[in-house]
Amino acid sequence: MNEDNQEQIEGRAQYIVGMDAHSKKLAISIWECSDLWKPMLYKEIRCCAITDMEATYKNNVPKDSITIIESSTNSATLKKRLEDIGFRAGIVRADIISDKERKRKVRDIQDARNLAKAYIKGNIQEFIWVPSDQYADYRDVHFAHRDTVKEMTRTSNRIWSICSRKGYNLPIRSGATKGESIRKMVEQLQISGFIKERLEMLVADYEFFLKRKEKLEKLMAEAIIENDKMLALMQLPGFYYHAAFVIAAIVEDAKRFSSAAKLTAYAGLSPMVNTSGEEEQKAMLKGGLGKPLDDEGRMDLKFYCCEAGQTILNLCSKSDIGKWGWRMINKGKPKNKVCCAIGRKLITYAWHILRGDPTPNRDGEGVFKRKMVRFYSELGKQRMIELGYPTRVDFANSMSARFYGHLPESIKAKE
């Protein structure tokens, strides 16, 4: 699902530029639109190297123009490069010109023309949100951490597969000691030949990814200390610093969503409104009831919210939202569906927090302090002392005062 946060288009320019970009080249179609009823083709550049884009624009594209770029991997970078040299640009959905005509005319310059014509005709009303440089870096950290965890898990599964196939003692699953336990096993069983070489190679890969994961988690923790939005999200039950970092990095500015329901839909946690009997039957075969969730939305947001729902049901059952979840389960609702419902509630609360709405009461203060006590160790005592927090208690009290200090002391936190 494309973000509902799109930037509103500013006043129309005299020249409309459609751009179809690839990894190494792009096609440009420029239209003169002083009369919107009779747009005239001004110039076309059928093939231009991306490295020459700035020079091409300065020599061929008028300043009073706006460039329409189809969403792709490098579209945000191209938009920023154009803005750096004084040209306006906007990114539109990748399906904005997907129709029968496009299927018949699969050419770069034709796509560029169609983008320009779609804007001229008024079919493009808004642009896709582009994250700021800082939050783009946060997203890169998140993607790197996600990929590292995947590679570490794959490597661990390969080690397990070899040990199971050869009848060796299966290695323990804890990360830091896995490599040493496998080396001891190789020595005790006197394993030799290619299998020994293969296990040693996989252990080296596993330890590399483990160190990489720890380094990226340190970067996340450092970012959270400096970002009040991320810290504030940790007030929510089921959200530790990984979830808080990812949700804040992906959303950035909650005000780009007009309501919490829009953010919920963006996360893919809203049930389908118009569903066919076939879709509902497929959902029932998977154990679901009623209308299923759609397959759209940001999977990273959906993942962390549903995981938080599982955590609340298993570990925070005495909280208000945990009690609500178990009431639904006791009424016969499937547990997985209840987890999604809790995740939908959490992303709604997150919308209010990211908007800067003040904490309404002290109900979650106790849980938040315990999270801060645990979070103290993520950066290490030496780093925390440098930041001015000599003990865990000092850090927890300081963070708690930041979000709960405006509330009267008479409103006590629930245990």
What positions do the PLM features span?
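Gly/Thr-rich phosphate-binding beta-strand-loop-beta motif of the actin/hexokinase/Hsp70
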Residues: 8-32, 115
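Nucleic-acid-processing active sites and adjacent nucleic-acid-binding tracks
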Residues: 34-65
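Low-complexity, acidic/Ser/Thr- and charged residue-rich accessory regions of DNA metabolism proteins
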Residues: 325-343, 347-415
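Short alpha-helix plus adjacent loop in nuclease-associated cores
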Residues: 83, 90-127, 279-296
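A short, charged helix-loop
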Residues: 116-140, 181-191
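Phosphate-backbone recognition surface of nucleic-acid-processing proteins
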Residues: 232-235, 241, 246-331, 335
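Glycine-rich, often acidic, oxyanion-interacting loops/wings at catalytic, nucleic-acid
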Residues: 146-232
